[in-house]
Amino acid sequence: EAREVSFRSLKKMSAAERNASLAAGTLGISFYEWIDERFNLPQPDLIDLSKERERPDVAARLLRQHWGLGDRPIGNLLKLYEAKGIRVLSLSENTRNVDAYSFWHSDSPYMFLNQQKTAERSNFDSAHELAHLVLHFHVDAATAPTEDAEKQADQFASAFLMPEADIKGRIGHVY
C-alpha cells in the first residue's frame, strides 16, 4: 500500500515517478510471490532494532554482529541482502528522481533501488533502506517522524558501511 512506503525526497519526484515506483512495488510483490511458490528462497534474517532508533550506530553494529560480518568492508551488499532474505529489485528508468525505498509485506522485507546512480551512492542508498527495515518497520509511514527517521537511516548507513573500529584501525596506520 502507498501509505506503507516512505519516500526520501518528495521535492524532486513527480507524481508520475511516484506512481511508477509504487507500481514497481506491486509488481515486485507479485514477482516474488511467484518465485516463492516455486523456489526455496532464504527466510528473512533481520532483527528488530527499533529500540536503538536513537542510537543508529549501535543498531548498525548489532546487525553486523547478528550477521557475523565483523568490522571489515562488505564485498557485495546486494548478495548479502538477498542471502539474508531481503527481496531486492531495481527501479525502472522512468523513476530517475527516486533514490530507493523499502517496506515489509507479509513478513518479507522489500528494497527497491535506483540503478542509475554510482556504485557508492547505490551502496549508501541500500544501507539507508536497510536501516528503515530494521529501525522503523513498526512505524506507520504516514505518522513516522520523517526528518528524524531519515537522519537515523543516514547515520545507520554510515556506521554499517564504515564501522568505527575499522576506520580507526585504518586511520591509525596512515598517521
Segments predicted by a language model, with ranges:
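Short juxta-domain linker segments that transition from a proline/glycine-rich
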Residues: 1-175
